[in-house]
């Protein structure tokens, strides 16, 4: 069996590597992928994610069994619809189902209609009305671009002035283009955040281990929001009862609701949750695997990944098993200046030894192909599975101290919340 993974980041590296380790898989192509993936025997295809017709032609020419779609923008652009129209299988939601992610207002409407707990909100395309709502509600308050904004379209405003400025940047200054033509303004929810993922086909779903991401750029959850600077799974201090509540009050009604709306969901559903004093509530949905959570969840999968996905797509009950013990922890290494302006072309340290996994993202080979260089904001991620969060931290941070990646930076406290609890 030959498979195609669409995307280029650390998430796609983790997906493709796990698929290649599956029994019936002979070859995994990644389009466009990144040069670091070739170190794990993955084959790169020089086609960008937006070129649906070229991807379809490649899949047909190379007799690809099915494609796994990684990035949100491809799903929002209807890549799964295009593959299906061409008679090809793709694991991911249609454009209509992926609206759970590409329109925050749509997601809110679904949650309200199907009684799913989430923050109170208002949606606005008019700046003056948004400003009046902010002033009426007070701070802290959250301002979100309605559409996709590379994980940068959310502002947690601590003052009314900050919130008004965020709304102005989105609605008047066109900061996020069409994605910010509407804003969703939400009440601020206080509590601990965690992520819940599920493999989904219609109203059938299969929950993965819980995970906790670290969005802020710097230690102590300081600095700007990023795509994610590290993660660990499972979340050891999160009671199973909370997960069960989230499944029954959030995941199940949303997926059954999507079927009722004529938008049945196929693919990976990410639910960003916060555990409040009133129980778990939804912060956001993503219509695909998270990055960096994929890189710490998939190493815990002990069943055959490709077979699992194939079964789910075929409507067959999959045999999915997960590692029961230990914790998987990963730290992202990013370019100095990320998530804003940063330099490219910084030489990467030597590949790690032993059982630490390296997932590559923003990298490319030097001209003589002897050296990997930085070529993006998030560059690579080191991942290990150990008996505890502390043991995982010790192993990764010892390795990073030895690498001493000049021109790059990382957080020193990934997983520390679990140790403090």
Swiss-Prot record:
What is an example of a Pfam family matching this protein?
GARS_N
Originating species: Streptococcus pyogenes serotype M3 (strain ATCC BAA-595 / MGAS315)
User: Which reactions fall under this protein's catalytic activity?
Assistant: 5-phospho-beta-D-ribosylamine + glycine + ATP = N(1)-(5-phospho-beta-D-ribosyl)glycinamide + ADP + phosphate + H(+)
Name the UniProt key words of this record, in alphabetical order: ATP-binding, Ligase, Magnesium, Manganese, Metal-binding, Nucleotide-binding, Purine biosynthesis
Q: NCBIfam families of this UniProt entry? A: purD (TIGR00877)
**Belongs to which family?**
Belongs to the GARS family.
**So which cofactors does this thing need?**
Mg(2+); Mn(2+)
Q: What is its EC number?
A: 6.3.4.13
- What are the binding positions for Mg(2+) in this chain? 284, 286
| Name the record gives this protein | Phosphoribosylamine--glycine ligase
Q: Which biological processes are named by the entry's GO terms? A: 'de novo' IMP biosynthetic process; purine nucleobase biosynthetic process
């Amino acid at each position: 069996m030959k498979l195609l993974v669409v995307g280029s980041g650390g998430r796609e590296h983790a997906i493709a590597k796990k698929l290649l380790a599956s029994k019936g898989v002979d070859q995994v192509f990644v389009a466009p992928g990144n040069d670091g993936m070739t170190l794990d025997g993955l084959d790169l295809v020089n086609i960008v994610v937006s070129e649906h017709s070229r991807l379809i032609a490649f899949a047909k020419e190379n007799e690809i069994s099915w494609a796994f779609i990684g990035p949100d923008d491809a799903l929002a652009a209807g890549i799964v619809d295009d593959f299906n129209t061409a008679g090809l299988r793709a694991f991911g939601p249609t454009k209509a189902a992926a609206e759970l992610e590409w329109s925050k207002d749509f997601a809110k409407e679904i949650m309200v209609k199907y009684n799913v707990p989430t923050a109170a909100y208002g949606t606005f395309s008019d700046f003056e009305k948004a400003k009046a709502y902010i002033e009426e509600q007070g701070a802290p308050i959250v301002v979100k671009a309605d559409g996709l904004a590379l994980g940068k379209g959310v502002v947690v405003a601590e003052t009314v002035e900050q919130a008004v400025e965020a709304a102005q940047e989105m609605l008047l200054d066109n900061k996020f283009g069409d994605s910010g033509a509407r804003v969703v303004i939400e009440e601020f929810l206080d509590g601990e955040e965690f992520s819940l993922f599920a493999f989904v086909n219609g109203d059938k779903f299969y929950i993965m281990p819980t995970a906790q991401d670290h969005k802020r750029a710097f230690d102590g959850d300081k600095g700007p929001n990023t795509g994610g600077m590290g993660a660990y799974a499972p979340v050891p201090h999160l009671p199973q009862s909370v997960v069960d509540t989230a499944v029954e009050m959030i995941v199940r009604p949303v997926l059954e609701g999507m079927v009722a709306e004529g938008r049945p969901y196929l693919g990976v559903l990410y639910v960003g949750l916060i555990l409040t004093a009133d129980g778990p509530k939804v912060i956001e949905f993503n219509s695909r695997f998270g990055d960096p959570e994929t890189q710490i969840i998939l190493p815990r999968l002990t069943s055959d990944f490709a077979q699992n996905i194939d079964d789910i797509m075929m409507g067959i009950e999959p045999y999915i098993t997960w590692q029961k013990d230990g914790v998987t922890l990963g730290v992202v290494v990013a370019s100095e200046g990320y998530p804003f302006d940063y330099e490219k072309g910084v030489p990467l340290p030597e590949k790690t030894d032993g059982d630490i996994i390296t997932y590559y993202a923003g990298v490319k080979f030097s001209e003589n192909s002897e050296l990997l260089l930085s070529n993006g904001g998030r560059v690579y991620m080191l991942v290990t599975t150990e008996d505890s969060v502390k043991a995982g931290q010790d192993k990764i941070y010892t390795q990073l101290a030895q690498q001493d990646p000049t021109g790059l930076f990382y957080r020193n406290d990934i997983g520390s919340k679990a140790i403090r609890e």
